[in-house]
Amino acid sequence: MDINEEAYAIQEEVVEFRRALHRCPEIAFHETMTMEYIREHLEEWEISYKIFDPSGIIAVVGNGKKETIALRADMDALEVQEETGLDFASLNHGCMHACGHDGHTAILLATAKILKKHESELDRRVYLVFQPAEETAEGARFMLKTGVLDSVKRIYGVHIFNGIPSGKISLEACLLYTSDAADE
C-alpha cells in the first residue's frame, strides 16, 4: 500500500478528528482541550512530543541524517458564534472554527499517524508543529522562541482553500493567508 492509499484508508478517521476538534474550538493561547486531544493520539501512536505552556505541541518522527523539516498546523479558533446547525457544531458559545484550523490539525494528526508507521523509512527527522494563536503573529513568535525549531531547515504549512480543486495542491514561495505578519 502506498502513502496515498494509506491516507484514503484513514479518511473517515480524519473526518472524525476534524469533527471532534470542530465541536470544541478554543481561542488563541487557550487551546487546552485541543492540546489534550492531540496528546492522547500522539501517545496512542507512541509518538514523542513536547508541550509548551500556555499552548503548543511539537511532536517528532524519524531520526534520519538529512536536514530536519517541520510540518505545521494551526489550532486556534475565532470568536464567532456558529449558526450552522451541524450535528458537530461548536459547543463553545461565541467560538468557532470558521477558517479551517480544525481541518488543518486533523490533517497533521493523520500525517503523524502515517509517518510513524513509516518511521524506519524516513531519512530525516520531521517535527510536527501544532501551533497556537495563528490568527495573529504571536503564535508563530511563541513557537520560534522555544528554540526547538532552530535546527529546522524548512517549515511546510497547509491551508484549506475552496479555490483549488480537491486532490490538487498549490505551492507558493511567498506569504499566504497571513493577517499580521505580511509587513514583517
PLM-predicted stretches and their roles:
Residues D180-E184:
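A short, hydrophobic C-terminal helix/tail in secreted or cell-surface proteins
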Residues L78-V80, L86-M96, G103, S120-S179:
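Histidine/acidic-residue-rich, glycine-tolerant segments that coordinate divalent metal ions
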